[in-house]
């Protein structure tokens, strides 16, 4: 009964409002084991978190060459070391940029697109020179170095960016350990323009934009909660202000912050985020996640 209640609770805020591609057209019996697992996660009948461990053999050993997970384990360990500040036990700018890069690579897509999405084009084309991506250029250069280092092992930039986003979350204390699936093909064609939300969009504009990406209003709030670790690097001069008071940690302070009448000292709130927090269509979900990290984690990993 407790498990059933958890599934029902997750379904209230399903990030994906609909399935598409093979997940929508193929019957369960026609899907691969991995396809079934991904479908179950998207439908909130399976958990997107995992505590399963993996002990990798030596990098140059025949065993590692035969096991695709082995190469990714070495990449993951290297990335995590670049994202987590052990001295302060916080995540750093590379972690938060990696989260954003994963989102920008995947979200430049909608149901009408014939290309785009999580295809690695953020690294493989000139997308990092676009205004909405320019603040990530330095982090992108670092990620390109990782890609070049392991390219001979057959990795894709598309998978690397999504792994980087998940590890960026994990590098922030409190971040959930999100399951990772590899196998995304690369496409160097620049992503379609105009499919990422500007910071001055209203809640209704954001909801309409994400509906075309199959993301529900509740899913938008779960997704935008990643701003708990973000900083506004578009600000002119001085340190980049955070979007809540604890940018080095993965907590629900972001939701608390945006339910307050005015911003806390030193905090910058994007107009779009404030609009979402005030909207009758998304504001109740801000309230649901405020102080309820477990509830937010359950939804955000799906």
Which stretches of residues belong to each language-model region?
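Catalytic cores of secreted/periplasmic or lumenal enzymes
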Residues: 1-302
